[in-house]
Amino acid sequence: MNNYLEKVNKIDSNSALKFGILFSLIFTGLIFLANTYWFSEPELLPKPEGVAFWYKWQLNDPTWLTRASVWLLYLGHQGSIWWLIYKAQEEKPTYSEGLHWFNIAALLANAFFITMHLFQTGIWYDGLAQDVLEVSAQWSVIVLLFMVLIMENQRRGMFLGKKIGFVSNAAVSIRKYHGYYFAWATIYTFWYHPMVGTQGHLMGFLYMFLLLLQGSLFFTRMHLNPKWTIFLEATVVVHAMLVALAAGHNWPMFLFGFLGVFVVTQMYGLPISQKMRWLIWVAFTGVFIGVYSYKGWDTWHEIFFVSGTLWACAILFSGLILLIQPKNTISEEG
């Protein structure tokens, strides 16, 4: 057993990350091919009258078997990853360059359930969307994003590199338990959707694969790598814009909303010079002026809807955490 653990620990987490990214790209391609040559779209549930936002990829006539197929696989996926997080925290390992046994187990579990989801879509189609609200899947990821803002406040600040003290204090409890929530948010959202081959779905599944990969590398140095983690945060820009374009929604609001979070908050966690930051600001401002000069300046303030929601939620949630967080938690962390 000790020899096995030593061999596992020699597997570099950086190499595991690269292999995981390659797997994610290849599997996204498999979803496209499956939708092109295998899947046939069933009769979908029509949009009810008076519903503003509607997720149309739901069976019009679901059965107990179609529902059971997705719920059993979802619960198996969720339970296995939560169990691995629990066992890992029980061991209290140090962050290492190599993989731990539970990293290997998490990577294999995620790869298995990703593959099962493809077959489940091809045979039974439905995701969790049949039984839960669309807003639950959306907000599960939104909460994940602003929780990252809270946890990273101590390292990169919240606004232009400036830290908010009480947010850093609130991050202590979040940092300890965030793995359970992040695992739920990603796995729940992953099983919400059938593996459909639209642009938005393909980008969304690629993003979910990368988040599952990040979650599998807990207690390794790559899990904390700022370039990788900020890449994950910023990737949501592309996904949100593609979904907005496909749905005919207001794509500039999502593009500049999420880019605004990047230039105001996230890029201050990157090891780049002040000159490079100014260049990024100039590029952001130039594109913003160009788009809204064409679109019209009467709605320019909409860019604060997305970024403002994330910042406000991060600050308000931090205040709520401090109200319920035991007073000795901060001193214990220190």
Task: Give names to the regions the model predicted.
Residues N2-E6, S80-G98, E152-V172, S216-T229, ...:
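Cytoplasmic membrane-interface regions of multi-pass membrane proteins
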Residues L59-L65, F159-A171, I187-V196, L211-M222, ...:
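Short juxtamembrane and helix-loop transition motifs at transmembrane-helix boundaries
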